[in-house]
Amino acid sequence: MASLPITPESANLSNITGHFQTGQGPCPRLTIYPIVRAGPGYYGDRGDICLSESSTAGAGFLSDVCRDWEAAALPAEDAGIRVVHLRIGVIISRNGGALPQMLTPFKLGVGGRIGSGRQFWSWVTLEDVVGAIHHVIDNETVRGAVNCVAPEPVTNNDFTKTLGAALGRPSVFPMPAFAARLALGQMANDLLLSSTRVFPRRLESSGYDFLQPNLAHALETEINAR
């Protein structure tokens, strides 16, 4: 969800309750567990508040989509099936997601913060997304909401400065909030300008060791990979 545009039309995909209907009673022999992908947008725009899996849902379109998406798995949970709601942050990958879209302006020397730059972005590498999925599948004690984000959320200002440094380019040309809204409408508020300072408490407490916990190293690895 963090790497794809979310629109009111695509939000209808959250109406997937029927796919989780399992009949009456528990299914003790079922060994395939649904992993429901959501995102930190579940928490809404929360400023610099530290957010964990126990934090309440926020308000707004994207928060509503995430909440409805997770609620669609309730029939499976009610049937006794272990369900994991993986709330995946902004994915750092050279092959897709947010990073390739950001590289061009920065390579041209016209990149910079978005809006005030004070909004927190909760990010994660694709390598750790895959690692987290394997971890929650193998660890049967993990269920419910799991924040799949790196343990070091950063402000957009720090993110863009770190990206510029990794490319050896300046990051002094900000995108004003109004320009982001002109380009993306309400999605700018939900995806770029909102602040979600999310921490992966359940992954860490269940023993997952992040492969790329540091943003600078993660960006350098992705940018320099061949």
What are the functions of these language-model segments?
Residues 57-62, 89-96, 116-126, 137:
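Glycine-rich "substrate-gating" loop/helix at the edge of Rossmann-like oxidoreductase active sites
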